[in-house]
Regions:
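Flexible "arm" and connector segments at domain edges
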Residues: 1-130
Length: 130
C-alpha cells in the first residue's frame, strides 16, 4: 500500500515543483524542514478538532491528509525505497514489547509499554543497505 501512496504523492510533488529526494537525507533546506513539520502539526490539530466535534467525516479527512503529508515528508527525506523495511523493523520491535508471558503491559492512559524482551529497531542497518 505504501508504495502506491508514495508514487502518487511523488507525482504531486513533481507536478507542483516540490522537493523530491532520491537518496535518504536529513540535509534539507531549513524552510522545507519547517514546512514539513508545520504541515504535520496542522493536520494533527485538525484531527483533534474533528474528534472533539465527533465528526467522522472530518476525522477521515484529517487522517487522509496526515497520510498524504507523511508520504510527502518521506519523499522529501528520500526514504521512499526504505520505508517499508523501516516499518517492518518497527513492527518487529513493537511486538517485542510483550511481557515474559506474552501479554501486553499498559500505562494508565492505555499506552503500550516496553516489556523485558523489548529491542530497539535497528533502523541504521536499513539505511546503510544499498
Amino acid at each position: 500500500m505504501i508504495k502506491k501512496l508514495v508514487e502518487e504523492v511523488t507525482a504531486f510533488h513533481h507536478a507542483f515543483g516540490l522537493n523530491v529526494s532520491t537518496n535518504p537525507t536529513v540535509d534539507l533546506p531549513e524552510e522545507i524542514k519547517k514546512l514539513r513539520y508545520n504541515l504535520m502539526k496542522e493536520e494533527n490539530e485538525e484531527y483533534l478538532e474533528a474528534i472533539k466535534n465527533d465528526d467522522l467525516v472530518e476525522v477521515a479527512d484529517a487522517l487522509g491528509d496526515m497520510l498524504y503529508i507523511l508520504c510527502g515528508t518521506i519523499i522529501s527525506h528520500g526514504l521512499q525505497d526504505k520505508m517499508e523495511y523501516i516499518f517492518d523493523e518497527i513492527q518487529r520491535s513493537n511486538m517485542s514489547k510483550l511481557d515474559t508471558n506474552g501479554r501486553p503491559i499498559y500505562r494508565d492512559d492505555g499506552k503500550v509499554m516496553k516489556g523485558p524482551n523489548y529491542f530497539k529497531p535497528n533502523i541504521a542497518a536499513i539505511l546503510k543497505e544499498p
